[in-house]
């Protein structure tokens, strides 16, 4: 039975998206020649050179390490808000920005200082297995570098003696390595001495990963994307706030199982979680190092609020607004010659 009307013109052709597979495009139409001129038409063999060849050798050597991985999901709200406070201060003063990786990396350094038994490497001494306890932390930083042709390579330079640096010094050393990696001016010494590495595939949207552990290191930490849980991505911001849904991130700790056990790896991730949640004065130390004249936000548990029966919350918000209007100058940074944190109890959000 026909369901079309003969007196109507034929329907226009449906719009079909161009094929994305190079094979499909080469078999069906001109898209292969018009969209991707550099798409190969036959198999090609390229010899790995320089950094790519070194990476391949290190990856093959890493297969000799028996590894295991611990993972932990942590809330990112406090990290996001305190980073915004720091960057707002920097924008008003000396310029620059602090990244999530800066804060996470320094929290990891502090955690390893508190758990020195994890700052170790496996070695052979006199033909027998041994563990070397390192006096200082060699902090490896995985950097994705693109050349002029758009080819990407991985470089892992090292911040030497990271445990001896303040947060501000750590940020400067971090930025120096990144800048020299981008300009191909790193030296051989910059790649030696790592005891732990931090890799952040979360910048690409990766939720979690299990990175390879290189020979000579005890563990490698992976950081996932900072985002809302996938099941809530379609929810409006207002609804997310009403539900108390915040952004989270996954951490992974891949370690040499010959010298580090799973319980210790789990405690390390718990300690990093505690620091990024502000439970041991971590943000106070960071703010002091960066000369931020403000009190960092603190982690507080949420509570239910019924606007139909509880009238106290709007009144307290009004009082806080009035306090800032009338006494906000008491917390202002008005001394250009010295760093001083000014506080007033009426201006505290927790009040």
Place the predicted regions along the sequence by residue.
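C-terminal catalytic/motor cores of large multi-domain enzyme assemblies
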Residues: 1-314, 327, 334
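Extended, highly charged clamp/arch subdomains and adjacent linkers
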Residues: 305-351
């Amino acid at each position: 039975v026909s369901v079309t009307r003969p007196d109507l013109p034929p329907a226009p052709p449906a719009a079909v998206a161009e094929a994305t597979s190079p094979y499909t495009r080469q078999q069906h139409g001109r898209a292969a020649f018009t969209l991707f001129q550099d798409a190969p038409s036959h198999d090609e063999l390229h010899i790995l050179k320089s950094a790519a060849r070194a990476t391949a050798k290190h990856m093959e050597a890493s297969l000799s390490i028996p590894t295991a991985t611990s993972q932990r999901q942590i809330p990112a709200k406090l990290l996001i808000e305190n980073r915004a406070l720091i960057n707002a201060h920097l924008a008003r003063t000396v310029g620059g920005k602090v990244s999530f990786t800066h804060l996470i990396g320094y929290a990891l350094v502090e955690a390893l200082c508190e758990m020195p038994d994890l700052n170790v490497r496996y070695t052979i001494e006199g033909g027998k297995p041994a563990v070397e306890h390192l006096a200082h932390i060699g902090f490896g930083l995985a950097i994705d570098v693109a050349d002029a042709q758009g080819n990407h390579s991985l470089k892992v330079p090292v911040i030497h003696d990271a445990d001896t640096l303040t947060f501000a010094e750590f940020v400067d050393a971090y930025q120096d390595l990144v800048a020299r990696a981008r300009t191909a001016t790193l030296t051989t010494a910059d790649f030696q001495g790592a005891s732990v590495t931090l890799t952040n595939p979360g910048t690409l949207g990766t939720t979690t990963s299990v990175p390879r552990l290189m020979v000579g290191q005890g563990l490698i930490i992976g950081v996932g994307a900072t985002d809302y849980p996938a099941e809530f991505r379609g929810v409006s911001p207002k609804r997310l706030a009403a539900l108390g849904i915040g952004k989270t991130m996954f951490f992974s700790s891949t370690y040499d199982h010959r010298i580090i056990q799973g319980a210790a790896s789990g405690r390390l991730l718990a300690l990093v979680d505690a620091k990024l949640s502000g439970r041991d004065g971590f943000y106070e130390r960071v703010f002091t190092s960066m000369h931020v004249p403000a009190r960092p936000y603190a982690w507080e548990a949420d509570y239910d609020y019924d606007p139909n029966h509880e009238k106290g919350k709007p009144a307290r918000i009004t009082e806080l607004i009035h306090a800032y209007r009338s006494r906000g100058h008491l917390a202002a940074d008005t001394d250009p010659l010295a760093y001083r944190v000014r506080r007033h109890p009426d201006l505290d959000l927790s009040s």
